[in-house]
């Protein structure tokens, strides 16, 4: 069993999950006020507040990584040094080995993701991380509910 989580809550189970896939939400994921979401809703203050409520719950993340020892860290990188610094700070803070770090390209369309692949590939080679795609977006582009 694999659980995909942003780490907002510690998932207490009777036994450790086979694999935790941890994708924390950094500040580059905060919705922009007034834009339309992929679901067709306009981002308002309430949505931003809800997004930020548990965005980086370090206590829950620490508990999760201690209890579920088989995990990987899958942050989304938007190509900026600022986000790369946050990714590395988080990794070091939580003592996550580089070989458990899988960088995903930022983007919510097939075209945007493909445009990021070379940059992400070069960065992970330079920093000793792994790269993973976002295959659901490559396969279905902006289609929802797949």
Predicted regions and their residues:
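Conserved AdoMet/S-adenosylmethionine-binding subsite of the radical SAM
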Residues: 1-146
